[in-house]
Curated annotation (Swiss-Prot):
<keyword id="KW-0808">Transferase</keyword>
<keyword id="KW-0408">Iron</keyword>
<dbReference type="Pfam" id="PF05958">
    <property type="entry name" value="tRNA_U5-meth_tr"/>
</dbReference>
<dbReference type="InterPro" id="IPR012340">
    <property type="entry name" value="NA-bd_OB-fold"/>
</dbReference>
<dbReference type="InterPro" id="IPR002792">
    <property type="entry name" value="TRAM_dom"/>
</dbReference>
<feature type="binding site">
    <location>
        <position position="250"/>
    </location>
    <ligand>
        <name>S-adenosyl-L-methionine</name>
    </ligand>
</feature>
<feature type="active site" description="Nucleophile">
    <location>
        <position position="343"/>
    </location>
</feature>
<protein>
    <recommendedName>
        <fullName>Uncharacterized RNA methyltransferase Bd3828</fullName>
        <ecNumber>2.1.1.-</ecNumber>
    </recommendedName>
</protein>
<dbReference type="GO" id="GO:0070475">
    <property type="term" value="P:rRNA base methylation"/>
</dbReference>
<dbReference type="GO" id="GO:0051539">
    <property type="term" value="F:4 iron, 4 sulfur cluster binding"/>
</dbReference>
<dbReference type="GO" id="GO:0046872">
    <property type="term" value="F:metal ion binding"/>
</dbReference>
<feature type="binding site">
    <location>
        <position position="273"/>
    </location>
    <ligand>
        <name>S-adenosyl-L-methionine</name>
    </ligand>
</feature>
<feature type="binding site">
    <location>
        <position position="83"/>
    </location>
    <ligand>
        <name>[4Fe-4S] cluster</name>
    </ligand>
</feature>
<comment type="similarity">
    <text>Belongs to the class I-like SAM-binding methyltransferase superfamily. RNA M5U methyltransferase family.</text>
</comment>
<feature type="domain" description="TRAM">
    <location>
        <begin position="12"/>
        <end position="70"/>
    </location>
</feature>
<dbReference type="InterPro" id="IPR029063">
    <property type="entry name" value="SAM-dependent_MTases_sf"/>
</dbReference>
<keyword id="KW-0004">4Fe-4S</keyword>
Length: 393
C-alpha cells in the first residue's frame, strides 16, 4: 500500500512500518490516542502516559491505526490483567488499566464529547459513580461455541478464545459453563455462535439459542449492582413532582417504569417499547390501571404523543441514541423535566445538541442541570451517563 498524505501535507508512515508513539489518552472505543506528525494514531491495548513502539496496521486520510510491538516506558496506570485471556479475548479492552484510571478516562471522555458537540453548554458535572463490583458483575452474556470450542470471540475476529470462566460475569452464570458446553455438544451442531445465558428475575440461570425470530431477552441492564444506584439517582433527579403524566421511552421491561409508578402515585404512567417480548413481560406485571405500555418505536409514538408542560419524560435509548425528530419533538412539547440515560457518549452529545438547537430556535428556555457518569461496565470502555434537563424559569 502506498503512503498517503495527512492534512498537513507530510507523508504518513507506510503500512507495516514501526514508529515510536507517546499515548496521550484513551478514545471512545477503547484505543489509546497518539499523534505522529500531526496525524492521530489509535492503538488498541495501549495505556495513557506511556511510550511504545508501534506497527502501523491501517492508514487513512485523517488517522492511522497501529498495534503495540513493544512497551518502551510503561504507563503508571498499566497493570497485568486479572484475566488470563484478557489480551486475546474481545470481551474486555481495558483490563490492562487500573480501575481508578478507567474511571478517570471515562469521566473525561464524556465531558470532552459533550463539549465537542456544544462547547457553550454549561452544566454541573458530578464525579463518576464507581461500580460496587469491578469484577463478577454481568448477569447476561453471549458465549460462543464452534467445533467443540467454548468461549468468546477474539478481539476483532470470529475466532473463539477458549475459556471456562469470565471474570466480569457473575459466578452464578460461569458455574454453568460446563453444563452449557455439554448442552451445545449434544445439539450436534458445528457452529452455535448465538448462545445467550442470563440470570432470570427469579434468580435461576437460563440459556438457549437466539434466533432471527427471537432476539433473546432484549435490552436489560447487565450490572444489577450498579443499576440500583442508577435507579436511585434517576428517581432523585426526577424530583417530587407532581406530574400529570410520566413517560418512560425505550422502556424495556420496565426497569424505570415500575419504580416511577411507585414514586408518582397520582400520575399516569406510560411506557413505550418496541421489543414485543419485553412489552409482554412488562404488561404481565402491571396491576395498576394508571399504567399503559405501548408497543412502538419511539419516533412513531412521538408523532401522536400528547406530552405536556406538566409531564416528566425519562428516556433510556440504545447505543444509537434517540432520533433528531424525537429530540426536536421533546423540545417543542416542553415537559417540565427530562431524565436522559445514555450508554454512548457520542449519541448523548448529539441528542443534547439537537435538543438545545431546537429550544433556541423556538425561543424556549431549558437548562442542562447536571450530568453524571456511572461505571456500569468495568474493564471496558463502555460507560453509562445520566443527564437532567429542566425548564429554566
Amino acid at each position: 500500500m502506498s503512503a498517503k498524505s495527512n492534512q498537513r501535507g507530510a507523508k504518513a508512515p507506510l503500512l507495516g512500518s514501526k514508529i515510536k508513539l507517546n499515548i496521550e489518552k484513551l478514545a471512545i472505543g477503547g484505543a489509546g490516542v497518539a499523534r505522529h506528525e500531526g496525524m492521530v494514531v489509535f492503538v488498541p491495548q495501549a495505556a495513557p502516559n506511556e511510550e511504545i513502539l508501534a506497527e502501523i496496521t491501517l492508514v487513512k486520510k485523517n488517522f492511522m491505526e497501529a498495534r503495540v510491538v513493544e512497551i518502551l516506558t510503561a504507563s503508571p496506570h498499566r497493570r497485568e490483567p486479572p484475566c488470563p485471556v484478557a489480551h486475546t479475548c474481545g470481551g474486555c479492552n481495558w483490563q490492562h488499566i487500573t480501575e481508578e484510571e478507567q474511571r478517570r478516562q471515562k469521566h473525561t471522555l464524556v465531558l470532552e464529547t459533550i463539549k465537542k458537540f456544544n462547547r457553550d453548554l454549561e452544566f454541573n458535572y458530578l464525579p463518576i459513580q464507581p461500580s460496587p463490583r469491578v469484577l463478577r458483575y454481568r448477569n447476561r452474556i453471549q458465549p460462543k461455541f464452534k467445533n467443540g470450542r467454548f468461549g468468546f470471540f477474539a478481539r476483532n475476529s470470529h475466532q473463539i478464545v477458549e475459556t471456562m470462566d469470565c471474570l466480569i460475569t457473575e459466578e452464578t452464570l460461569t458455574d454453568k459453563f460446563a453444563e452449557v458446553k455439554a448442552w451445545a455438544e449434544k445439539k450436534n451442531a458445528k457452529d452455535l455462535q448465538r448462545l445467550e445465558m442470563y440470570i432470570a428475575e427469579e434468580g435461576d440461570v437460563r440459556y438457549g439459542l437466539i434466533t432471527d425470530e427471537d432476539d433473546g431477552i432484549g435490552f436489560s441492564q447487565v450490572n444489577r449492582f450498579q443499576n440500583e444506584d442508577l435507579l436511585r439517582t434517576a428517581l432523585d433527579w426526577a424530583g417530587d413532582g407532581p406530574y400529570k403524566k410520566v413517560y418512560d421511552l425505550y422502556a424495556g421491561a420496565g426497569n424505570f417504569t415500575f419504580p416511577l409508578a411507585a414514586k408518582y402515585a397520582g400520575s399516569e404512567i406510560i411506557g413505550v417499547e418496541l421489543n414485543p417480548k419485553l412489552v409482554e413481560r412488562a404488561r404481565s406485571k402491571i396491576t395498576d390501571k394508571r399504567m399503559t405500555y405501548f408497543m412502538s418505536d419511539v419516533e412513531t409514538y412521538m408523532r401522536r404523543a400528547s406530552i405536556g408542560k406538566d409531564d416528566l419524560v425519562v428516556l433510556d435509548p440504545p447505543r444509537a441514541g434517540a432520533s433528531e425528530y424525537t429530540m426536536q419533538t421533546l423540545a417543542a412539547a416542553q415537559p417540565r423535566k427530562i431524565i436522559y440515560i445514555s450508554c454512548h457518549p457520542v449519541s448523548l452529545a448529539r441528542d443534547l445538541n439537537w435538543f438545545f438547537a431546537q429550544t433556541q430556535k423556538l425561543g424556549i428556555k431549558y437548562k442542562l442541570d447536571r450530568v453524571q457518569t456511572f461505571e456500569m461496565f468495568p474493564q471496558t470502555d463502555h460507560v453509562e451517563t445520566i443527564a437532567e434537563l429542566r425548564v429554566d424559569s
